[in-house]
């Protein structure tokens, strides 16, 4: 964006939103197979509706007997996810909903394009374009609207799960309109929060009284003023929620998962996909590169685009845009990236250590802007490439 003064809005959804529940199950299935075999091939999709969960897709393990054994564990994995999220309502309960497993072995025709062979490196799992973005407007180098929209829902989930606010239920959405002055976020012009709750007698005002202190707690001081508009459960009662209220599907919240609309998106979803799928791994490394460009002080904001062809190992293109904030030309940054980073699927996986069971935790509250974990989770949020990039210029 070239404008300096404007209002920009992003939304988030909770871990109990039907689509996010499906993302969680798909990534939990992925983690289970990767824990057994780090180079397992997985494309797991989940559908959820009233009293029913259906899991389908493709899985590949080198040991076919283990593959069949693991199929028997899928139902328990799904139920554990539903239980942890907190669904115990009449028409969607972790113990009583029907779980159907339709996973099957990966197509040999897909595998032949991806698998490494003599004289041929591992190819990309599909064609596509992937984007990464970073901005210095928050310490996490994320756009402020999506960062704080996630923070609101994460805090409400905490107080719901620890029993502090027992009337809150899992399904929720947030939306923040953030005012920018001179290109920096300075306040919130409107707050939208819809959350499922237990009691039909509770009004919108009752729910606002519960959630407002937590929303104020996670937003920077001074961002909420007397002019801030509040829309809490604006339709009134929200007792029927989760998959009983709206069907859920894996991969339907790709803007929530990334930058809240503040950056382009290539269209590919993440959850349920192993790291040979560049929809996921290349989007992660694009974020890693953009974040390190900004962390290195080379720009205040940065977009990176990568493109791939199925079965081809190296990216077809590398694109950088610093929106006029760069300390060096974008072409120099592109060349430096090509020098210091192996952007083949294998190179990405090895550099970011992606062949680990680290994906279930990514399914809610954004894949980006999270703190790297000691076990390798969110490795794409590290800034260990910043000095290397500067040295390559």
From Swiss-Prot:
The keyword Transferase applies. Signal peptide: none annotated. K(+) binds at residue 45. Binds 2 divalent ions per subunit. Binds 1 potassium ion per subunit. Mg(2+) binds at residue 19. Gene3D superfamilies: 3.30.300.10. Pathway: Amino-acid biosynthesis; S-adenosyl-L-methionine biosynthesis; S-adenosyl-L-methionine from L-methionine: step 1/1. Its cofactor is Mg(2+); K(+). Residues 106-116 are annotated as: Flexible loop. GO terms for cellular component: cytoplasm. It is found in: Cytoplasm. L-methionine binds at residues 58, 106, 246, 277. It catalyses: L-methionine + ATP + H2O = S-adenosyl-L-methionine + phosphate + diphosphate. ATP binds at residues 17, 171-173, 246, 252-253, 269, 273. It holds the Pfam family S-AdoMet_synt_M. CDD domains: S-AdoMet_synt (cd18079). Its EC number is 2.5.1.6. Its main location: cytoplasm. Keywords: ATP-binding, Cytoplasm, Magnesium, Metal-binding, Nucleotide-binding, One-carbon metabolism, Potassium, Transferase. GO terms for biological process: one-carbon metabolic process; S-adenosylmethionine biosynthetic process. Catalyzes the formation of S-adenosylmethionine (AdoMet) from methionine and ATP. The overall synthetic reaction is composed of two sequential steps, AdoMet formation and the subsequent tripolyphosphate hydrolysis which occurs prior to release of AdoMet from the enzyme. Belongs to the AdoMet synthase family. Homotetramer; dimer of dimers. HAMAP family: S_AdoMet_synth1. This is S-adenosylmethionine synthase. It comes from Roseobacter denitrificans (strain ATCC 33942 / OCh 114).
């Amino acid at each position: 964006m070239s404008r300096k003064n404007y209002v920009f809005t992003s939304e988030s959804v909770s871990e109990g939103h039907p689509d996010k529940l499906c993302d969680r199950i798909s990534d939990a299935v992925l983690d289970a197979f990767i824990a057994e075999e780090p180079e397992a091939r997985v494309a797991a999709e989940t559908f959820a509706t009233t009293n029913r969960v259906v899991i389908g897709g493709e899985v590949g393990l080198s040991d076919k007997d283990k593959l069949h054994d693991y199929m028997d564990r899928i139902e328990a994995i799904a139920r554990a996810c539903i239980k942890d999220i907190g669904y115990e309502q009449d028409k969607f309960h972790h113990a009583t909903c029907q779980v159907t497993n339709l996973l099957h072995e990966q197509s040999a025709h897909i595998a032949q394009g991806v698998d490494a062979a003599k004289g041929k490196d591992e190819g990309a799992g599909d064609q596509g374009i992937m984007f990464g973005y970073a901005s210095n407007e928050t310490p996490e180098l994320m756009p402020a609207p999506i960062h704080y929209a996630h923070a609101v829902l994460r805090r409400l989930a905490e107080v719901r799960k620890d029993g502090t606010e027992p009337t809150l239920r899992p399904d929720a959405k947030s939306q923040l309109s953030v005012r920018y002055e001179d290109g920096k976020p300075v306040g919130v012009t409107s707050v939208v929060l819809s959350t499922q709750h237990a009691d039909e007698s509770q009004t919108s005002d009752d729910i606002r009284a519960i959630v407002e202190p937590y929303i104020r707690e996670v937003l920077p001081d001074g961002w909420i003023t007397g002019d801030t508009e509040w829309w809490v459960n604006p339709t009134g009662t929200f007792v029927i929620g989760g998959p009983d209220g709206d069907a859920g599907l894996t991969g339907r919240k790709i803007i929530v998962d990334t930058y809240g609309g503040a950056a382009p998106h290539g269209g590919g979803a993440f959850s349920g996909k192993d790291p040979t799928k560049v929809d996921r791994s290349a989007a992660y490394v694009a974020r890693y590169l953009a974040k390190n460009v900004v962390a290195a002080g080379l720009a205040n904001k940065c977009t990176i685009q990568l493109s791939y062809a199925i079965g081809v190992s190296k990216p077809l293109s590398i694109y950088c845009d610093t929106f006029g904030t760069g300390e060096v030309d974008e072409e120099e940054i592109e060349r430096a990236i090509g020098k210091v980073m192996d952007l083949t699927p294998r190179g990405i996986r090895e550099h970011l250590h992606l062949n680990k069971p680290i994906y279930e935790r990514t399914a809610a509250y954004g894949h980006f802007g999270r703190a790297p974990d000691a076990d390798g989770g969110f490795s794409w949020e590290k800034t260990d490439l910043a000095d290397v990039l500067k040295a390559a210029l």
